[in-house]
Curated annotation (Swiss-Prot):
Multidrug efflux pump that functions as a Na(+)/drug antiporter. The gene is norM. This is Multidrug resistance protein NorM. Keywords: Antiport, Cell inner membrane, Cell membrane, Ion transport, Membrane, Sodium, Sodium transport, Transmembrane, Transmembrane helix, Transport. InterPro entries: MATE_fam, MATE_MdtK, MdtK-like. It is a multi-pass membrane protein.
Length: 460
C-alpha cells in the first residue's frame, strides 16, 4: 500500500503543473469565447466553428510529437540522456514539416464551412479567423516539441509557467484586436485568431529561452551540437507518433464534426453547444494531465526495466483519474447554471447550455478512464492499440449514433444537438472499455513489454 501512496504522490507532483499549463492553454479558448461573445452571438459562433477546424488540424501535429515524451522518458530512465538532443532535433524538423500541410488545410478550409450552409456573415468571420490563426501552427508545434523534451525529463513546471504567460498575453491582445483598442482594427471574432497567433509565437520563444539557460537542462546540452535532419529518424518518429496523432484526431474530430453538423440549427444552438464543449474541455484537462504524468512514469519505469513499477503507475493513475472525475461531475451538476452565465447573458443560450452540461457531467467518468488508459499505453509504446480503439469508439460508435439520434427519425423523432451528446457518451464509454481491456491484456503479457523495451534500446 505504501508503494501505491508514493506513486500517487509522484503522479500528483507531475500532473499538477501539466494541469495548470493545460488549463491556461484551454483558458485561451475560454477567453476567446467570452470576448467574442461580447461582440455578438455570430462572432461567438464563428470562433466555435473555426475552432472545430483549427483544433483537429493542429492537434494532429501535437499527437505526432507526443511520441517524444515516452522516448525521452525511457532514455532518461535507462541512463542514456545524452542521446536525448538527437531525438529532439529530429522532432523540431518533424514539427516544421508537419506545420506546412496544417497551414494549407486551414487556408483552404472555406469550402468545409460553405458546405455546412451557414449564414454569409458567419462564414466570413469563420474564414477570417482561420486565415489569421494558421500562422500559429509552426509556433504551436515547435513549442510542443520543447514541452515534450522537458516533460520527458519529468520537468513539467516550465510549460505551466509559460502557459500562464500566454494566457496573460492573450487577454490584452484580444482586447486590442477584438474591440479595436490602442489603434488596432476592431476585428471581432477574427481578432481572436490574430491574438492566438501572436501568443503562440511568444510561448515558443519563451520556451526556447528557458531550455537554453535552465541549469537543470545543462547536463543534456540540447543546443551544444545541433544535429542535421536524418530522414530515417524523422520517419521513425513520424511512424511512432502517427497512431497517437490519429487517435487524437479521431477524438477531436468527433467533437469538431458535431460542431459543424449542428451549425445549420442556428447561432443559438451553436453558441450553447460551444459553451458546454468549452467547459467540458476545461474539465478534461484534469484527467489529461494525469494521463501525461502516467505516460512519463510508465516510460521511466520501463527504461529502468521495472515492469511491476510501470503497472503500479498505471493503476494509480486510473484510480486517481476516476476519483477526480467523480468530483468534477458532481460540481458540474450543482453549478452548471452559474457556469453558463459566465459565458453568455443570452437566456436562450444559457437554457440550452445548462441542459447540455448535464450530459457532459455524465460522460466525465468514462472520459477520464479512457484518457488515462491511453496515457499508460503511450508509456508502454503500444500506440497502434490506441489508434484502433479510438477509431472504433469515435467513428464507428460515437459519431454515427449521434447523427442517427440527432438528425434522423430512424429510432425516434430527431433530438437535434441532444442526440449528438448522447453519441459522445456512447463513444467515450466504448473507448474507456476497449483501452482498459487492452492495458490489462498488455500487463498480463510481459514478454510483449520486454520486446518493446529491448527494441527501443536497440534503435538507440
Amino acid at each position: 500500500m505504501h508503494r501505491y501512496q508514493k506513486e500517487i504522490v509522484r503522479l500528483i507532483k507531475l500532473s499538477t503543473p501539466v494541469l495548470i499549463a493545460s488549463v491556461a492553454q484551454t483558458g485561451m479558448g475560454f477567453v476567446d469565447t467570452v470576448m467574442a461573445g461580447g461582440v455578438s452571438a455570430t462572432d461567438m459562433a464563428a470562433v466555435a466553428i473555426a475552432a472545430s477546424v483549427w483544433l483537429p488540424s493542429v492537434l494532429f501535429g501535437v499527437g505526432l510529437l507526443m511520441a517524444l515524451v515516452p522516448v525521452v522518458a525511457q532514455l532518461n530512465g535507462s541512463g542514456k540522456s545524452k542521446k536525448v538532443p538527437f531525438e529532439i532535433h529530429q522532432g523540431v524538423y518533424l514539427a516544421l514539416l508537419t506545420s506546412i500541410p496544417i497551414m494549407l488545410v486551414l487556408y483552404n478550409a472555406g469550402f468545409i464551412i460553405a458546405a455546412m450552409d451557414v449564414e454569409p456573415e458567419l462564414y466570413e468571420k469563420t474564414q477570417g479567423y482561420l486565415h489569421a490563426v494558421l500562422w500559429a501552427a509552426p509556433a504551436f508545434l515547435l513549442f510542443q516539441t520543447l514541452r515534450s523534451f522537458c516533460e520527458g525529463l519529468s520537468l513539467t513546471t516550465p510549460a505551466m509557467i509559460i502557459g500562464f504567460i500566454g494566457l496573460a498575453a492573450n487577454v490584452p491582445l484580444n482586447w486590442m484586436f477584438v474591440y479595436g483598442e490602442l489603434g488596432a482594427p476592431a476585428l471581432g471574432g477574427v481578432g481572436c485568431g490574430v491574438a492566438t497567433a501572436i501568443v503562440y509565437w511568444l510561448m515558443f520563444l519563451t520556451m526556447t529561452l528557458y531550455t537554453f539557460i535552465a541549469p537543470k537542462l545543462r547536463r543534456v546540452n540540447l543546443y551544444e551540437n545541433w544535429n542535421k535532419p536524418q530522414r530515417k529518424e524523422i520517419y521513425r518518429l513520424f511512424k511512432l507518433g502517427l497512431p497517437v496523432a490519429l487517435s487524437i484526431f479521431f477524438e477531436v474530430t468527433l467533437f469538431a464534426a458535431v460542431a459543424l453538423l449542428v451549425s445549420p440549427l442556428g447561432s443559438t444552438v451553436v453558441a450553447a453547444h460551444q459553451v458546454a464543449i468549452n467547459f467540458s474541455s476545461l474539465i478534461f484537462m484534469i484527467p489529461m494531465s494525469i494521463a501525461v504524468a502516467v505516460s512519463i512514469r510508465v516510460g521511466h519505469k520501463l527504461g529502468e526495466k521495472d515492469l511491476d513499477g510501470a503497472k503500479v503507475a498505471s493503476y494509480c493513475g486510473l484510480a486517481f483519474g476516476l476519483l477526480m472525475a467523480c468530483c468534477t461531475a458532481i460540481l458540474t451538476l450543482i453549478f452548471r447554471e452559474q457556469i453558463a452565465y459566465l459565458y453568455s447573458d443570452n437566456q436562450e443560450v444559457i437554457t440550452l447550455a445548462v441542459s447540455l452540461m448535464l450530459l457532459a457531467a455524465i460522460y466525465q467518468c468514462t472520459d477520464a478512464v479512457q484518457v488515462v488508459a491511453a496515457g499508460a499505453l503511450r508509456g508502454y509504446k503500444d500506440m497502434n492499440a490506441i489508434f484502433k480503439c479510438t477509431f472504433v469508439s469515435y467513428w464507428i460508435v460515437g459519431l454515427p449514433s449521434g447523427y442517427v439520434l440527432g438528425m434522423t427519425d430512424w429510432i425516434r423523432e430527431p433530438m437535434g444537438v441532444y442526440g449528438f451528446w448522447f453519441g459522445f457518451i456512447g463513444g467515450l464509454t466504448t473507448s474507456a472499455i476497449l483501452l482498459t481491456c487492452r492495458l490489462l491484456w498488455l500487463q498480463r503479457n510481459p514478454t510483449r513489454i520486454d520486446m518493446e523495451v529491448d527494441e527501443l534500446q536497440i534503435m538507440h
